[in-house]
């Protein structure tokens, strides 16, 4: 049960203000912040005065917070007389605020309602019981759009869980909640005209995603990956998983977010990702049989007028639930094979003078956008809506990092864009040691954009897809601390940002999250590789960015518990040893399991080279739709390329199976480090020995392993597969930590 512990945000904070100028480690960092000498202490009664009726909800929001914080009665009044005063000041920057705490109390002035709410967020983060430091803050956001997306289709999150997330967004001045309400795996919002969408479409038998969660819960000793009993129901002999929001639920969540200055943007993904609709209402798809095609699911049929009418009717009900200007149509990852075979689609293409199925998708998107505009709404879509022609009024969420020209092209046309590049902003990807920093230091206004183009960058959001996120705890674990980095990236100006200082302030935020019982991800334990090679002796060293974390370990294959040995000092081994490590919070909450294999090796002997060599590697591309590296060579051969590094060759896309071969030449007898990043699977073999093994479906992940090599040439093979976009990169380092340049080490037969 959610206890709405977020209303108690600072009630539980007991960090001591030991002197009058103690720093308040606010995130996002304010534009200007000046400390005074002294503290303001609340009396026995608290009065919040507001000078504009539009601020009444904000006064009640703050009043509820202070009541929980201080255990005293708080009165809100429509005047400017009170310990706390809320007012509007149109001279402040848009959405900006000015906060002053002095002997008279707390004075909050905002350019608008959202500015006042942002000042309240600052107060929520300040550590106090009954006193606050004298301080003067002036602040305003850098970007208009500061958002998060939650996918409630793959796994369902209750109304209370969504409200908890929204309250956390408000704590960090985020102002756009992108609510992904429908997808193939579940329809999550009541549409009264089409009741089967929720009575059937919101419930499913366990699918592959559910089974992976259950399997990982065991493999990783993690109960947060188990499917919640509250989201199950039994029908006959079947156990179903799911749930949905009534229209009353949606109105309640929208009102809750509005009070906290957050706009909700609903997404009903179409024409693809629509299986939960087309499987329950026959006639929406091209053919009676629906399911999965070569890559994605059966889409809606844009050749049928009745299908378009269905979509309009769905959105008509949603318009009444969401009062804001933007709605999101999705528009990504559409399987067009059915459209090529469908008489209705082909008739539509001919009738409208379209060239192909890409333009048919664009025609469908434009039809829906016209309907949105006629109802006073503006359309947002994933960047695939640019294919086949983009309207002049659509806003694009750019997510495909392998389509880097989208931002430049869209903004050059005069359209707005919202950044959410998957490599950095997809927080369903496992967090690694550089993840927070990559978000924090992401450049939203790159030099290649003109001033006019930069004006069309609305901001940024991070997306949480929930195929493998079944619970509230796992959701919050994936959001934090990355949400905090995104908050500062989107709010603060670059000249105020510094990652070292942010890292210091992040420790203070961990204390807040601990007090609020938010199960954030304990930072990466570091200092070692996935596989560490040694010839005589190896030494395990461990560090953690959270100084309150306790690291425990085992060497017998069991998972560490609170009773396992605590890592205190470096551990030296002279035989192969398999460490399993796990950080624990002060309250005993377990973090993520990490494995470190210390492997005793002899140096691999170099091979004798008989043929003439040239710089580079050979990359063979196979039309591979499988999910294991060992079968790539059995797939149909497409083409061969020469590459100068381990990477995906230009023009290789779709179903990708790569076998990259050649030789690696190392200069000295040494232990070399290989950092292989891939999305999806990959492996690296040297002289036939497996060095890095990521032979699995995965989001972007870097595995770092070592191998002892004698100087000279060694046979080299990288295998890689992916089916939509993908990433592949290999960096090689010597024992001194210096990266070896690809042109110096890679060779292949002439």
Q: Could you describe each region identified by the protein language model?
A:
Residues 717-726:
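Short beta-strand-plus-loop segments that form exposed binding edges in beta-rich domains
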Residues 379-384, 389-394, 400-541:
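Flexible, acidic glycine-rich loops studded with aromatic residues
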